[in-house]
Amino acid sequence: MQESKQLTPLMRQYNDIKSKNTDLIVFFRLGDFYEMFDSDAREASRILGIALTQRGGVPMCGVPYHAAANYISKIIKEGRKVGICEQVGTGEGKSKLFERKIVRVITPGTVIEDNMLQSNVSNYLVCVFTDKKGWGAAAIDVSTGEFWVTEQADDISLNGLSCMLAALNPAEILLDKITLDRVKSSMMIPGSVATTIVPREESSQIPSNWPSQSVWAGKKTALTCALTAIKYINVNEPGFKDLLIPFYKEISDYLALDENAVRTLELVSQNGARKGSLWHLLDFTVTPMGGRTLKNWILNPLLNLADIEKRQNCVSNFYDNPLAYEELKVILADISDIERIMSRVGTGNAGPRDLAGLARSLAVHGALKNWFDKYGAVVPYLKENILSKITVIEDLANLLNSAIEPNPPIKISDGGIIKQGFNAELDDLRNTKNNSSKTLAELCEREKAKTGISTLKVGFNSVFGYYIEVSKGQSGKVPFSYTRKQTLTNAERFITEELKEIEDKILHAEEKILRLETSLFDSVRKHLAEHIGVMRSFAKAIAELDVYSNLAHCAKVYKFTKPVIDESNILKAADLRHPVVEACLPLGSFVPNDIDLGGETQISVITGPNMGGKSVYLKQAAVLVILAQMGSFVPAASAHVGIVDKIMTRIGAQDAIAMGQSTFMVEMKETSHILASCTPKSLILLDEVGRGTSTFDGISIAWAITEFLYKPHGGGAKVLFATHYFELTDLENKYKGIKNFHAEVQEYKDADGQSKIAFLYKIKEGAGDKSYGIHVGELAGLPATVIVRAKKVIKDLEAKKGTSVSKKEDDIVGDLFSSPIVEEIKLVNTDAVTPMQALQMILEWKKRINS
Ligand SMILES: Nc1ncnc2c1ncn2[C@@H]1O[C@H](COP(=O)(O)OP(=O)(O)O)[C@@H](O)[C@H]1O
Ligand SMILES: [Mg+2]
């Protein structure tokens, strides 16, 4: 940065502002542009892909102010915060320098503008604090007004927090240094999320519009989080504070999905995109609220049987009543994002189009009432809920309908927002404006007749405004009531009281119209704001309607059936499918499979070749549970789901490498988390656990994990373990509740007599017998020479060992020590190695044996 004495006043002003807002990218208003300087400019030019220029040696880049929203949204999506610095003074006075200040801070967690948000995604600002034994959190979606808090006093390992963050996928997180360190070390926050260090707001002063003291008893950390978050929002968007009222939510009311499960099951995104996810597959919702609610339900399946059945019944009723669905869809199509519009109404940020959208949305009240008259029994509890609000909705709809033009301009200042007939004064002003020439012509005729001056005419100039002009020759006839304004060579100009009044009306009509429209618009907005509570719960009910009918539609489209749900330990389904994988394959080519866990079998060990369908089989079990417990039908011929409390998965290690830990370390961390926190009600998916280390290590660990999870007298978590360690199939012989399955393949000879395999994707009882690795390698296009060589090696190995490499042995330990290293020793051509090479080989073997 330059020495301050060399700086221009402007740059000094900039530096001053920037130094107080180091964590913001400052959008510094200069005329029609927002300029960024220095490090901000470098960062912004990279994020926005715009050119970097210079100003007095300082890097700089800029964007036109009218297109700023687009650029701001890009910066926010990178997890950065933007400070909007506007010219606030008049720019007069000695310095001629506009006074400037930050008028608004836009952060990823506090945006409300539609064009900076994704319509069907909640945008959470989360505040988290840990304490000695547990943690508390507040989650706020400022754009919709959703605000809840929770606390777990007894969760030293922060497992619950990790699950919660995985489900919320926050846009921004507030925390203190201690919490940040703990959360970071356990990799709970992806790097792209904005984190802000804030001091704890440890007041016991609860805002008067919040739930009473008793709710917060023993919820100190949760309250601190709520107060801290509100304080932060209040600084950035002061209007919000009173609109946000928290409720306490017990996290343990929902099925816990760990971070690995949310990601690898591809519930709401696949490699970062919505497409390819379960949510995308299921989403036929019509309203933005419906889309968000669906996502929310997928990530937060229920645990309470009665609650699940309540949802299931609604879905079932829609399923049985296709007409109800069709007719509802038409009504919902007119409803825009009421939740987000109401947030902007509440903060005074709503524009004309917001209110026009609201008008259209609320205009459905009549159709909705009719629909409930006809189909109310489909959603009994929503009927009461919505009908109890319908008079308020109707009143507001009438107000909006009479007040707001259906297709108004974007900005209030463009005018033409308030409808004709809404306000007499406004109509009058508009008439005045429109009739100005007529009124003047009338005045002119009247004055001519009164004075008998035939040359009298009415004119206008910018200096004197409206005037009456009389030619010099006739000026003698001018009455006393005229006031002379100007004398020309052959004419005199006058004004009269009446002309002045008309002039006033005309000249100021436009300005008055604008002012009046603005104030009328504001009063409508304020009136709406008084009903924000009703409107929000109306929006919520609409969202639920949307999701129920949507799930019924999915059941039809994807051929789902209604599962039996109870409190048992059973997880059983016939002809179960993975809906997302199925949708990607040609029609009818997905192979359904049965599953039966929790009865005789506690743990299934599934072996089989790569690409055999093991992982898909594991995942579809989890998807079954999630769908069932969110209230949906499921992709199976029949299904019985005993309520599951947690789904924990250890699938695919590759992606975590990016976060800076070794694959194996990540794998073991996640596995230890599973072992530490599973309960008899949990479903655990272990996919190739142990792959990240040497074979011996891997087998031993996988073996020990399975034994750990096994509960000989029942009451163990349900486990599906896919593995390519054939050795694990021995567990079946030792433990009654462990059962072997394999992904079936068919071996056949092709035209050239080469043996090939076909994947059948059928998961069958019993251990398979071979690892088909070489065949898979062949299918994957390994060079023929490699395949031939591999086949030769395996043949030699088998011949030398006198048995198949992967044959079962009674004692797994014996099997281990008869394997790879011994085989390698046997293979060494002692005539062809130098003593040095031999020594190196021995060292290498020793290392592997000792590792
Ligand atoms: N039940 C099935 N029916 C049809 N195709 C399947 C089935 N299961 C898996 N597949 C196909 O096989 C591929 C590999 O499946 P996957 O479960 O990943 O194999 P594995 O885990 O055994 O290596 C999938 O991407 C899918 O295209
Ligand atoms: Mg797999």
UniProtKB/Swiss-Prot annotation:
Residues noted as binding ATP in the record, renumbered to the chain: G608, P609, N610, M611, G612, G613, K614, S615
Protein name: DNA mismatch repair protein MutS
Family under the similarity heading: Belongs to the DNA mismatch repair MutS family.
Gene giving rise to this polypeptide: mutS
Pfam families cross-referenced by the UniProt entry: MutS_I, MutS_II, MutS_III, MutS_IV, MutS_V
Record organism: Elusimicrobium minutum (strain Pei191)
BP GO terms, sorted: mismatch repair
GO molecular function, one term: ATP binding
Matches recorded under HAMAP family: MutS (MF_00096)
Keyword entries, A-Z: ATP-binding, DNA damage, DNA repair, DNA-binding, Nucleotide-binding
Gene Ontology CC entries for this record: cytosol
Alphabetized InterPro entries for the sequence: DNA_mismatch_repair_MutS, DNA_mismatch_repair_MutS-lik_N, DNA_mismatch_repair_MutS/MSH, DNA_mismatch_repair_MutS_C, DNA_mismatch_repair_MutS_clamp, DNA_mismatch_repair_MutS_core, DNA_mismatch_repair_MutS_N, DNA_mismatch_repair_MutS_sf
Superkingdom of this protein's organism: Bacteria
Disulfide bond sites: none
PANTHER family per UniProt: DNA MISMATCH REPAIR PROTEIN MSH1, MITOCHONDRIAL, DNA MISMATCH REPAIR PROTEIN MUTS FAMILY MEMBER
Role, per record: This protein is involved in the repair of mismatches in DNA. It is possible that it carries out the mismatch recognition step. This protein has a weak ATPase activity.
